[in-house]
């Protein structure tokens, strides 16, 4: 029997399960903003910096791509410590520290004049991006959502993809003025936009007097949800084949994505002969397909008729 609930009513129920906007969705919006900042200013603009740094200092692509590779190593090694820090101090503090490092790193980048200083600055930026980015944000989202967790994660990731669409703006700034000016402005944007935004992040729904997904549950149901999360530890996870298969698949995917991020724009400028802005426009097409993928994810995780009722 078809549901009598309209799509608009379903959306309203999703975002306002108790007559007001569930605070978890504000956290998702903030996460999307932070992902946007990290994506447009650094992760997806790194190829632009390799081009301008190669032109100014004649550093080889091997040296420049090596710096990016070290950031990925740093991210992997920092992961376990980062998880402990978030559990110990909460995501808001860790995000703030990370964004401060991220912003300062860009201000230092605008003054770099040697390969050693560049590598040290990239290290500061990469630690800042890790602490003030995806993994820390996901801790809050996972705590705030259960039934709608997939949708919440997908919506938060929209920020990163939208950041990729805006990479041509960064390229235009580098061509119109100078990459050092762009780096300095980027540092200011991170501090002025990112740090105030993450002050609204909360670790768990209880801190705002709310419940998971914004749905009022009976006491025994709340206990069941908490026990389900607490009973499956990281030690249990590493014993399952699924953990290692997902990790391997994710690692292979990131290898491909990282290669495109670092080498696509340099290839289009040096190999094909395009201008920096033209190359970035072609690069931004990657983000369009990312958005399509996220859209499919949201489509296939839409509420079932049973959930809407």
What residue spans do the PLM features occupy?
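Helix-loop-helix hairpin linking two adjacent transmembrane segments in secondary transporters
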Residues: 160-206
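Extracytoplasmic
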Residues: 26-51, 59, 260-265
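Extracytoplasmic gate region of multi-pass secondary transporters
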Residues: 46-47, 241-284
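Hydrophobic core of transmembrane alpha-helices in multi-pass small-molecule transporters
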Residues: 117-132
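Central cavity-lining transmembrane alpha-helices of secondary-active solute carriers
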Residues: 69-82, 284-296
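C-terminal ends and interior cores of transmembrane alpha-helices
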Residues: 101-113
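Conserved small/polar residues in nucleotide/adenosyl-binding loops
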Residues: 300-309
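Intracellular juxtamembrane helix-capping segments at the cytosolic ends
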Residues: 132-145
């Amino acid at each position: 029997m078809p549901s009598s609930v309209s799509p608009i009513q379903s959306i309203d129920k999703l975002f306002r399960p108790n007559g007001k906007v569930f605070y978890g969705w504000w956290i998702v919006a903030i996460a999307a903003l932070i992902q946007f900042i990290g994506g447009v200013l650094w992760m997806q603009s790194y190829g632009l910096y390799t081009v301008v740094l190669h032109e100014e200092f004649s550093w080889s692509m091997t040296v420049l791509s090596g710096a990016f590779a070290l950031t990925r190593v740093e991210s992997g090694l920092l992961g376990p410590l980062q998880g402990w820090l978030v559990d110990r101090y909460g995501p808001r503090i860790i995000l703030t520290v990370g964004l401060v490092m991220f912003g300062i790193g860009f201000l230092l980048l605008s003054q770099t004049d040697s390969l050693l200083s560049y590598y040290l600055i990239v290290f500061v930026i990469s630690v800042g991006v890790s602490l003030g980015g995806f993994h820390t944000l996901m801790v809050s989202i996972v705590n705030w959502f259960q039934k709608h967790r997939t949708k919440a994660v997908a919506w938060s990731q929209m920020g990163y993809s939208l950041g990729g669409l805006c990479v041509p703006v960064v390229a235009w700034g580098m061509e119109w003025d100078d990459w050092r000016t762009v780096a300095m402005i980027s540092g200011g944007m991170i501090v002025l936009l990112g740090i105030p935004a993450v002050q609204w992040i909360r670790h768990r729904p209880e801190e705002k007097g709310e419940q998971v997904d914004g749905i009022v549950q009976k006491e025994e149901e709340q206990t069941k949800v908490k026990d389900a999360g607490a009973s499956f530890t990281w030690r249990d996870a590493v014993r399952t084949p699924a953990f290692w298969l997902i990790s391997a698949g994710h690692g292979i995917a990131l290898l491909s994505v990282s290669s495109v991020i670092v080498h696509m724009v340099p290839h289009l400028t040096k190999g094909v002969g395009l201008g920096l802005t033209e190359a970035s426009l072609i690069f931004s097409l990657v983000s369009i397909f990312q958005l399509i993928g996220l859209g499919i994810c949201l489509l296939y995780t839409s509420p079932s008729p049973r959930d809407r009722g």
